[in-house]
């Protein structure tokens, strides 16, 4: 809002033309909004939810003491994000809108799940199948839009779209304009190969399927991680900070050329959006730190993961997400391997066996009698190391 109104003015308001300034301002604004309105929203949720989020008895220390804590705290994160982006973001940027579309669509899915759990006082919400179908549908639309936006800067045009080329051309009309052409003609429908300068593996229309897997996978990985007080939000802010840097570098032709990464016109504006997320995430931690006054619920975790996934796709740094979001990947893999190994061994021997004492992985360490705070802080340490390692890969080319 302020960008559109004042950026053209000279003098002090010229600062609004700098993404770095607006990103910092979005961090501070979102943090203040989240902290100032936190108690009010938590009291509202507590009054509306009564018994709060149902807690499944996993025979873990202090677990049932969390009974009665309100959920849907993701609304607090989204409040700070909206205000931060509305004030400091460029609302004419299509990458901002497609990211917000995925974020809030996934947040709505999460809200429906949380609402079902609270109203039925059951740990079972919306079926996993329904959530996956809706999640893949949302991701498919977002990836098609991103592919169309990238196609505006691709010499080969929109050949991958076939009979839907007019739609691709219409989407491309919203893309930020630039006279710089991508170094690789497969930029639109390709996947960047790690550690190789400006080379994209051509996938054509299958790029949409690949992007869907990235977005849905990220959303569910963050959802798996959100199991202890403060566990998910801090790694999320570290990952957001790393991708804010990537978005800024990707959207700047000079820096992108120096690092040998693909220049994506307009993608730098995602740094402002991620800055608002960092601020609201820190503000949410104010209330979610042990012992938590509120849980983010699926309202928060699905939207956060969806945002991380769509930013990775938009900046063409999908594989970097495996490193930057390494903690989320480990948590998700622990769940998948636990389920898979149990089913395989049950089929082969008649008795299912487990790799971990309990999955996701943070519960495994709780079962080993680690205090909750020790698990959380050590996972935070790992997450910042993963984020730094992911940024380091930008120069390994």
From Swiss-Prot:
The keyword Cell membrane applies. Keywords: Cell cycle, Cell division, Cell inner membrane, Cell membrane, Cell shape, Cell wall biogenesis/degradation, Magnesium, Membrane, Metal-binding, Peptidoglycan synthesis, Transferase, Transmembrane, Transmembrane helix. It is a multi-pass membrane protein. It is an enzyme of class 2 (transferase). InterPro entries: Glycosyl_transferase_4 (IPR000715), PNAcMuramoyl-5peptid_Trfase (IPR003524), PNAcMuramoyl-5peptid_Trfase_CS (IPR018480). Its main location: membrane. One of its GO terms (cellular component) is plasma membrane. Its EC number is 2.7.8.13. One of its GO terms (molecular function) is metal ion binding. Catalyzes the initial step of the lipid cycle reactions in the biosynthesis of the cell wall peptidoglycan: transfers peptidoglycan precursor phospho-MurNAc-pentapeptide from UDP-MurNAc-pentapeptide onto the lipid carrier undecaprenyl phosphate, yielding undecaprenyl-pyrophosphoryl-MurNAc-pentapeptide, known as lipid I. NCBIfam families: mraY. This is Phospho-N-acetylmuramoyl-pentapeptide-transferase. It comes from Hyphomonas neptunium (strain ATCC 15444). The lineage of its organism: Bacteria, Pseudomonadati, Pseudomonadota, Alphaproteobacteria, Hyphomonadales. The gene is mraY.
């Amino acid at each position: 809002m302020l960008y559109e109104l004042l950026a053209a003015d000279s003098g002090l308001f010229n600062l609004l033309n700098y993404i770095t300034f607006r990103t910092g301002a979005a961090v501070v604004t979102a943090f203040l909004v989240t902290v100032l309105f936190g108690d009010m929203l938590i009291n509202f949720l507590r009054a509306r939810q009564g018994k709060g989020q149902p807690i499944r008895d996993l025979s873990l220390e202090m677990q049932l003491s969390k009974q009665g804590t309100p959920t849907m705290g993701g609304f607090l994160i989204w409040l700070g994000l909206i205000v931060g982006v509305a004030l400091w973001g460029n609302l004419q940027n299509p990458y901002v809108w497609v990211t917000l579309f995925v974020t809030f669509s996934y947040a709505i899915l999460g809200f429906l799940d949380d609402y079902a759990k609270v109203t039925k006082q059951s740990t079972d919400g919306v079926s996993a199948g329904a959530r996956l179908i809706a999640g893949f549908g949302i991701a498919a639309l977002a990836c098609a839009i991103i592919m169309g936006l990238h196609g505006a800067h691709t010499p080969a045009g929109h050949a991958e779209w076939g009979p839907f080329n007019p739609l691709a051309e219409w989407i491309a009309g919203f893309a930020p304009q630039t006279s710089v052409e991508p170094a690789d003609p497969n930029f639109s429908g390709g996947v960047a190969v790690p550690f190789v300068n400006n080379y994209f593996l051509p996938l054509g229309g299958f790029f949409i399927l690949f992007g869907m897997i990235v977005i849905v996978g990220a959303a569910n990985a963050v959802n798996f991680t959100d199991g202890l007080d403060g566990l998910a939000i801090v790694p999320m802010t570290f990952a957001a900070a790393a991708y804010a840097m990537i978005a800024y570098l990707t959207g700047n032709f000079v820096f992108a050329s120096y690092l040998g990464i693909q220049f994506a016109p307009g993608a730098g504006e995602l740094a402002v959006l991620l800055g608002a997320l960092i601020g609201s995430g820190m503000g949410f931690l104010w209330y979610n730190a042990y012992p938590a006054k509120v849980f983010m619920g699926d309202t928060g975790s699905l939207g956060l993961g969806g945002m991380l996934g769509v930013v990775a796709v938009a900046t063409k740094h999908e594989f970097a997400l495996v490193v930057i979001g390494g903690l989320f990947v480990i948590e998700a893999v622990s769940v998948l391997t636990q389920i898979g190994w149990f089913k395989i061994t049950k089929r082969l021997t008649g008795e299912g066996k487990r790799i971990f004492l309990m999955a996701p992985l943070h519960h495994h360490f709780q079962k080993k009698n680690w205090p909750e705070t020790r698990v959380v802080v050590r996972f935070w340490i790992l997450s910042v190391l993963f984020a730094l390692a992911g940024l380091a890969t930008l120069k390994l080319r």
